[in-house]
């Protein structure tokens, strides 16, 4: 084969549409130089062949570095144990508040205090009718069992006005009993107002009056308080 024929065989023909400028050098010139020096027909092929182990290692390093950065960012957003405990306490407090708001230990118009429900009347009746009204509500005219309860009821009644309690001596003068038949505890006699009970005018029923107790005619019309034990599980958390 002649030298001219061999030269034509080795010559690479590059289409005109591949001729473009890259950093001031024509694409065709670069392709020709690659073909002459390395026997590569195009720049794309050169790019593929340039993927040596060093390049792959560099790419792997960059990938791992990026992954580590993402992990660090995610870990930094996780709350510390102290913050988690604070969040837990706030959630428990919120739960308790929601529980209290949704769970009612007493029926509507009744007031809860120390495990019992109290109904404070808005109307006035005599002592006997007040006792009957409480029974119709499934309760009793209030029986006082503790000093805390006495303080609570006395303060509430003082703001409302004279109020009946479930205490009388109608069956035996000067011997006071509650509506359930139990006797008045001697420790509670200190709650009588000074000079009371005096039984003036056949006063056989007890009322909350001012800062203490007073005996009064059972026919008088007063407010009244009913009491019953709360049976709701809401009373305990």
Curated annotation (Swiss-Prot):
Residues that carry a glycan: 114, 129
Extracellular domain ranges by topology: 76-237
A Pfam family assignment: Lectin_C
One GO-annotated biological process of the protein: defense response to bacterium
Keyword Disulfide bond assigned: yes
Gene Ontology MF terms: D-mannose binding; identical protein binding; metal ion binding
Its membrane topology: Single-pass type II membrane protein
Cytoplasmic side: 1-54
Chief location bin: membrane
Alphabetized SMART domains for the sequence: CLECT
Endpoints of the signal sequence: none
Transmembrane domains' residue ranges: 55-75
Residues annotated to bind Ca(2+): 196, 198, 203, 214-215
Record-annotated C-type lectin domain positions: 112-227
Subcellular location: Membrane
GO cellular component: membrane
Keywords from the named record: Calcium, Disulfide bond, Endocytosis, Glycoprotein, Lectin, Mannose-binding, Membrane, Metal-binding, Receptor, Signal-anchor, Transmembrane, Transmembrane helix
Annotated disulfide bonds: 106-117, 134-226, 205-218
PROSITE patterns: C_TYPE_LECTIN_1, C_TYPE_LECTIN_2
PANTHER family per record: MANNOSE, PHOSPHOLIPASE, LECTIN RECEPTOR RELATED
Function of the protein: Probable pathogen-recognition receptor. May mediate the endocytosis of pathogens which are subsequently degraded in lysosomal compartments. May recognize in a calcium-dependent manner high mannose N-linked oligosaccharides in a variety of pathogen antigens.
Name of the protein: CD209 antigen-like protein D
Gene: Cd209d
